[in-house]
């Protein structure tokens, strides 16, 4: 699902760019400033902004737009998409500006730090934001993910999967998985983060070749700036 999101992103952007007459609002943030908070280069940030303008309303996007663009879903709500959106909607307004949009994509960039991916994936599963993952939270994510992908497993099989997960991860035997235990589990099984990388984000300026860049910079990773 994650591997296909940029194709949907590009497709929707091209449609909207050809059918929308209104000029979107100018970006308030300096591209260099936005880039510093991400793994994107300044040129990539400008490409992303052109994309953002094509899908936003008044410089903002809501959860439905976010889900449609990133996950190619419209009628079926995705718990994963909801969680990603909510974690970047820090003010609980139900909308994201461009900077939050860029940061939400940055964590899925293949060049994002592995530790950042571990931390973010932990937050995705910590549905109640209690600082640990409970069995019911894991089951909720597994059940919803399977349903969204069209897979049907018996409750017995699902419970067995969760049992094995906790047997390995819950080393403190307290019925929950904390950040330390989650990190250890992921380090043993890196494939748990396979959905945390979007390969096409490495070539965002090539994916959207029609977008015009205005900032003249040396195209080096933004984290090296300033």
Swiss-Prot record:
<keyword id="KW-0472">Membrane</keyword>
<dbReference type="GO" id="GO:0019722">
    <property type="term" value="P:calcium-mediated signaling"/>
</dbReference>
<dbReference type="InterPro" id="IPR011992">
    <property type="entry name" value="EF-hand-dom_pair"/>
</dbReference>
<dbReference type="Pfam" id="PF13499">
    <property type="entry name" value="EF-hand_7"/>
</dbReference>
<feature type="domain" description="EF-hand 4">
    <location>
        <begin position="157"/>
        <end position="192"/>
    </location>
</feature>
<keyword id="KW-0677">Repeat</keyword>
<dbReference type="GO" id="GO:0005829">
    <property type="term" value="C:cytosol"/>
</dbReference>
<dbReference type="GO" id="GO:0005774">
    <property type="term" value="C:vacuolar membrane"/>
</dbReference>
<comment type="function">
    <text>Acts as a calcium sensor. CBL proteins interact with CIPK serine-threonine protein kinases. Binding of a CBL protein to the regulatory NAF domain of a CIPK protein lead to the activation of the kinase in a calcium-dependent manner.</text>
</comment>
<feature type="domain" description="EF-hand 3">
    <location>
        <begin position="113"/>
        <end position="148"/>
    </location>
</feature>
<dbReference type="InterPro" id="IPR045198">
    <property type="entry name" value="CNBL1-10"/>
</dbReference>
<feature type="domain" description="EF-hand 1">
    <location>
        <begin position="20"/>
        <end position="75"/>
    </location>
</feature>
<dbReference type="GO" id="GO:0005509">
    <property type="term" value="F:calcium ion binding"/>
</dbReference>
<dbReference type="GO" id="GO:0019900">
    <property type="term" value="F:kinase binding"/>
</dbReference>
<protein>
    <recommendedName>
        <fullName>Calcineurin B-like protein 6</fullName>
    </recommendedName>
</protein>
<feature type="site" description="Involved in dimerization">
    <location>
        <position position="149"/>
    </location>
</feature>
<keyword id="KW-0449">Lipoprotein</keyword>
<feature type="domain" description="EF-hand 2">
    <location>
        <begin position="76"/>
        <end position="111"/>
    </location>
</feature>
<comment type="similarity">
    <text>Belongs to the calcineurin regulatory subunit family.</text>
</comment>
<comment type="subunit">
    <text>Homodimer.</text>
</comment>
<keyword id="KW-0926">Vacuole</keyword>
<dbReference type="InterPro" id="IPR002048">
    <property type="entry name" value="EF_hand_dom"/>
</dbReference>
């Amino acid at each position: 699902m994650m591997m296909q999101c940029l194709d949907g992103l590009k497709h929707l952007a091209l449609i909207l760019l050809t059918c929308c007459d209104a000029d979107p609002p100018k970006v308030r943030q300096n591209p260099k400033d936005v880039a510093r908070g991400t793994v994107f280069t300044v040129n990539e940030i400008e490409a992303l902004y052109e994309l953002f303008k094509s899908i936003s309303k008044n410089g903002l996007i809501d959860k439905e737009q976010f889900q449609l663009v990133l996950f190619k879903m419209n009628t079926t709500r995705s718990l994963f998409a909801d969680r990603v959106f909510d974690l970047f909607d820090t003010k609980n307004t139900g909308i994201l500006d461009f900077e939050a949009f860029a940061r939400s994509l940055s964590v899925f960039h293949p060049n994002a730090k592995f530790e950042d991916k571990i931390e973010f994936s932990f937050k995705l599963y910590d549905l109640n934001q209690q600082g640990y993952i409970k069995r019911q939270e894991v089951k909720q994510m597994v059940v919803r993910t399977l349903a969204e992908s069209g897979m049907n497993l018996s409750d017995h099989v699902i419970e067995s999967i969760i049992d094995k997960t906790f047997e390995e991860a819950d080393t403190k035997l307290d019925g929950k998985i904390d950040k330390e235990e989650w990190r250890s589990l992921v380090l043993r099984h890196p494939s748990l983060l396979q959905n945390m990388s979007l390969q096409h984000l490495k070539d965002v300026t090539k994916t959207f070749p029609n977008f015009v860049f205005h900032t003249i910079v040396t195209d080096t990773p933004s984290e090296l700036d300033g």
